[in-house]
């Protein structure tokens, strides 16, 4: 039964007119009705809240709402298959990432007369991955050049991926690709693989930050296809991963002042040629002609006034490793000359990363610009 609110002793009492008996009866009825309605409302809210909670759990496993490829519907009971949400493929950052990776692969394989147009369609059989890894690592793999059957393709892919994983030295849980996923043209697995390769070999490219893909996980339960969606991160903070998270003047030049960047390049070319001309050497392309480390080593000898014994470095390096050793040796000579350890990695220079090369040469210019 509804009760009257307790009166505060601080509030002065005011005369209250007496209500007729019939009004008291009405108040009692309305009070009961109000209590019933309140309880019903509360029960309804609880029911709605419970339904909302159940929907949050069950909706990810609701029947799929878009058309699947016929092959993706041929699942055994409880079998699980993942695929990219078709709507996610149109994401601008994902499109940018795929374009950057395709352009990078085509640049690396320009001498092989290989042109990649679609990552999933062109990389699934292992042929392009083999050529890409051989170029990056300067190592020939012992695999068949051409494979037609699915079994032969998977065997080749197995060998290529094992070699890649051995080189990358990633912990098992960080390896998000395998023979089956790559051969099945799983875009998520292929992107993870290419991003890992580009970061390990310090590819001279800029991957877009924080690229994610909406992945649909399809499962067959009691004869019905059900799905749930998860957000798969492909790239995080790519500058932090590559060790270039501290922005400097060269980041600003590249991003906002390409005209001034050309002036800096011409200044550095003039500076290095002033000294390399003494050996009848000349530089026209900064990013490529310093990539094997030879000119860097010779330049340090000229700037410091000593002869670098030819047995100390590879005069004609023919592998990625030898080029890295040359650049590392040049970095040691720079530190011996009083310079701080260069921020770029030797691999950055070998991979023709222009920004990294400019950083190294500008440090030399700052210290030795008055040397004749």
UniProtKB/Swiss-Prot annotation:
Disruption phenotype: Embryonic lethality, due to severe cardiovascular defects causing whole body edema and severe bleeding due to vessel rupture. Embryos show defects in the septation of the heart outflow tract. Their cardiomyocytes are round and fail to align in a parallel manner. Blood vessels are frequently enlarged and show numerous microaneurisms. Besides, blood vessels show abnormal constrictions and increased vascular sprouting. Vascular mural cells and pericytes display a rounded shape and impaired adhesion to the underlying vascular endothelium. Residues 21-25 are annotated as: Interaction with ARHGAP31. Belongs to the parvin family. It comes from Mus musculus. Its main location: other. SMART domains: CH. The modification Phosphoserine is found at residues 8, 14, 19, 28, 62. Pfam families: CH (PF00307). Residues 95-202, 262-369 form the Calponin-homology (CH) domain. This is Alpha-parvin. Residues 1-31 are annotated as: Disordered. PROSITE patterns: CH. One of its GO terms (cellular component) is Z disc. CDD domains: CH_PARVA_rpt1, CH_PARVA_rpt2. Keywords: Acetylation, Actin-binding, Angiogenesis, Cell adhesion, Cell junction, Cell membrane, Cell shape, Chemotaxis, Cilium biogenesis/degradation, Cytoplasm, Cytoskeleton, Membrane, Phosphoprotein, Repeat. It is a peripheral membrane protein. Plays a role in sarcomere organization and in smooth muscle cell contraction. Required for normal development of the embryonic cardiovascular system, and for normal septation of the heart outflow tract. Plays a role in sprouting angiogenesis and is required for normal adhesion of vascular smooth muscle cells to endothelial cells during blood vessel development. Plays a role in the reorganization of the actin cytoskeleton, formation of lamellipodia and ciliogenesis. Plays a role in the establishment of cell polarity, cell adhesion, cell spreading, and directed cell migration. It comes from the Eukaryota. InterPro entries: CH_dom (IPR001715), CH_dom_sf (IPR036872), Parvin (IPR028433). GO terms for molecular function: actin binding; protein kinase inhibitor activity. The modification N-acetylalanine is found at residue 2. PANTHER family: ALPHA-PARVIN, PARVIN. Residues 223-372 are annotated as: Required for interaction with TESK1 and ILK. One of its GO terms (biological process) is actin cytoskeleton organization.
């Amino acid at each position: 039964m509804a009760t009257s609110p307790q009166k505060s002793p601080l509030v002065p009492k005011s005369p209250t007119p007496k209500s007729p008996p019939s009004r008291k009866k009405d108040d009692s009825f309305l009070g009961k009705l109000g209590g019933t309605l309140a309880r019903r409302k509360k029960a309804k809210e609880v029911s709605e809240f419970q339904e909302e909670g159940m929907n949050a759990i069950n909706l990810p496993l609701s029947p799929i709402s878009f058309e699947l490829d016929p092959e993706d519907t041929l699942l055994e009971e409880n079998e699980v298959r993942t695929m990219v949400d078709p709507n996610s493929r149109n994401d601008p950052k994902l499109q940018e990432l795929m374009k950057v990776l395709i352009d990078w692969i085509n640049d690396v394989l320009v001498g092989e007369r290989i042109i990649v147009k679609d990552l999933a369609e062109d990389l699934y059989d292992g042929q392009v991955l083999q050529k890409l890894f051989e170029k990056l690592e300067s190592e020939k793999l012992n695999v068949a050049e051409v494979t037609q059957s699915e079994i032969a393709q998977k065997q080749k892919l197995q060998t290529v991926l094992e070699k890649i994983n051995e080189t990358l030295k990633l912990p098992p849980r960080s390896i998000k690709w395998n023979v089956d996923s790559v051969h099945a043209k799983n875009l998520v697995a292929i992107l993870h693989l290419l991003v890992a390769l580009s970061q390990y070999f310090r590819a001279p490219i800029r991957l877009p930050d924080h690229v994610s893909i909406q992945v649909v996980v399809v499962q067959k339960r009691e004869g019905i296809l059900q799905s749930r969606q998860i957000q798969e991160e492909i790239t995080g903070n790519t500058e932090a991963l590559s060790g270039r998270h501290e922005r400097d003047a060269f980041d600003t030049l590249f991003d906002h002042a390409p005209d001034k960047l050309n002036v800096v390049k011409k200044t550095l070319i003039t500076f290095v040629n002033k000294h390399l001309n003494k050996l009848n050497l000349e530089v026209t392309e900064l990013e490529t002609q310093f990539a094997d480390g030879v000119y860097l080593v010779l330049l340090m000898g000229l700037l410091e006034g000593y002869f670098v014994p030819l047995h100390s470095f590879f005069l004609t390096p023919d592998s990625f490793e030898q080029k890295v050793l040359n650049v590392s040796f040049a970095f040691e000579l720079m530190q011996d000359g009083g310079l701080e350890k260069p921020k770029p990695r030797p691999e950055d220079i070998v991979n023709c990363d222009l920004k990294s090369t400019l950083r190294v040469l500008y440090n030399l210019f700052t210290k030795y610009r008055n040397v004749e």
